A protein has these predicted regions:
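P-loop NTP-binding module
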Residues: 1-185
């Protein structure tokens, strides 16, 4: 995570301020972070924005739902043994999968690799899980697989209250961006 007083940190603080207004207006607690392709900075943006909210006293939970491209555990040198997929498949309890990374900042890793299907993500399990977690956290940020490699965003859209679409300057093609925007609406 970057120093929030650095130039990049100040940029994340500006994004956080804009996001804070949208969250307050929509009364959203569950925000998905998504990109078009892998390696566009989605996970980095998510973690730094989550950290900026945690730094002002918001109790934040980050969930890695990018099962095929799971990386959030690596930022904290954590194992990816038990996580979201294990909770969904009833192989682990929620409390077993929540890891405290710092004050006000918890993480649920993606867990073992599985194929998210309509039967898993469309089930009430994720909805019930998020309802339970919303009682404990001010904000829940969900790391969602890129739109070009997965339809997870569509499968999770019924439980995610808003999306942040992260693009990489001079890399994300405008046609792909248009497709992603259509995909999310």
């Amino acid at each position: 995570l970057i120093d929030l007083n650095s130039e990049a940190g100040k940029a994340y603080q500006k994004i956080k301020a804009s996001l804070e207004v949208a969250i307050r207006e929509k009364k959203s607690k569950v925000i998905g972070f998504i990109s078009v392709n892998h390696n566009e900075g989605k996970s980095t943006a998510l973690l730094n924005i989550a950290n900026s909210f945690a730094s002002i006293g918001k109790k934040v939970l980050v969930i890695d739902a990018d099962n095929k491209g799971a990386s959030l555990h690596l930022y904290f040198a954590l194992p990816n043994e038990k996580g979201l997929s294990d909770i969904i498949l009833d192989d682990a309890k929620v409390d077993e999968c929540i890891v405290s990374t710092s004050q006000n900042f918890d993480l649920i890793t993606s867990g073992k690799e599985v194929e998210y299907t309509d039967s898993i993500s469309g089930s009430d399990k994720i909805s019930k899980l998020l309802d339970e977690l919303k009682e404990k956290y001010d904000l829940i940020f969900v790391n969602v697989a890129p739109t070009k490699s997965s339809n997870d965003a569509v499968l999770l859209a019924h439980v995610i209250e808003g999306f942040v679409l992260v693009i990489k300057r001079k890399s994300t093609k405008s046609t792909d961006l248009d497709d992603a925007l259509k995909y999310l609406t």
